A protein has these predicted regions:
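Conserved nucleotide-sugar phosphate-binding/catalytic loop shared by glycosyltransferases and other
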Residues: 4-14, 31-80, 85, 166-168
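Short N-terminal targeting/anchoring amphipathic segment
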Residues: 88-107, 123-125
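Nucleotide-sugar donor-binding and catalytic loop/hinge architecture
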Residues: 1-5, 176-195
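Active-site-proximal region of nucleotide-activated glycan assembly enzymes
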Residues: 116-180, 188-190
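Glycine-rich, highly charged phosphate/nucleotide-binding loops
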Residues: 76-93, 177-181
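Glycine-rich phosphate-binding loop signature in dinucleotide/nucleotide-binding domains
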Residues: 32, 90-96, 186-190
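An aromatic- and histidine-rich active-site surface loop
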Residues: 45-49, 97-118
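Short amphipathic alpha-helix
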Residues: 17-28
Length: 197
């Protein structure tokens, strides 16, 4: 992998999208310290705070999800989607990424759609056993779809699927907490199996 790779990571809305995205960025930086990474998220969503706190630059799109209860409100949603696609096109043109990664959430839709239209390879990362709407819509143009669970060919083209598991932040893997420490901290019985629900 070249050290001067330029990568856009797009998506968010919830921690289920943001933290895997940060894990991907961290893994790329670990292998390619000179990599330039730009996040693209949704304005006024949690990624706009979490991503800069992790040390990465992020640009927000005015995109929002569809309102399934109040259909007339979707006129504004469609307008924001068109504005987001135009803004995503400008971001991509200015940043010139080598690849665009989508982690789900409605912010990844305009970004990856425009990247694909501009001939930039796109990769999707699906964290769930039931694929999200945005990733399903982007699957056809994606070069690769990384999934955490088997059986995802019911949502995605089988030839594009790579079973990778979910990205995990390095700091979680490097913990010094032992099983015995955890049992003591939570006051659990070490002789019993524990299931977290």
């Amino acid at each position: 992998m070249s050290n001067n790779i330029r990568l856009i990571v797009s998506g968010g809305g919830t921690g289920g999208h943001i933290f895997p995205a940060l894990s991907i960025a961290g893994a790329v930086k670990a292998k390619c310290p000179e990599a330039e990474i730009l996040f693209v998220g949704a304005e006024n969503r949690m990624e706009m705070q979490r991503v800069p706190a992790a040390g990465y630059r992020i640009i927000g799109l005015p995109v929002s999800g569809f309102d399934r209860k109040h259909l007339l409100k979707n006129i504004a949603v469609l307008w924001r989607l068109m504005k987001s696609r135009r803004k995503a096109r400008r971001i991509i043109r200015d940043f010139r990424p080598d690849v665009a990664v989508g982690v789900g959430g409605y912010a990844s839709g305009p970004t990856l759609k425009e990247a694909g239209a501009m001939g930039i390879p796109t990769l999707l990362q699906e964290q769930n056993s039931y694929a999200g709407v945005t990733n399903k819509l982007l699957a056809k143009q994606a070069a690769c779809i990384c999934v955490a669970y088997e059986g995802m060919e019911r949502f995605f083209p089988k030839d594009k699927i790579k079973l990778t598991g979910n990205p995990v932040r390095q700091n979680l893997l490097e913990t010094s907490i032992t099983h015995d420490d955890a049992v003591r901290t939570f006051g659990l019985d070490p002789a019993k199996k524990t299931v977290l629900i």
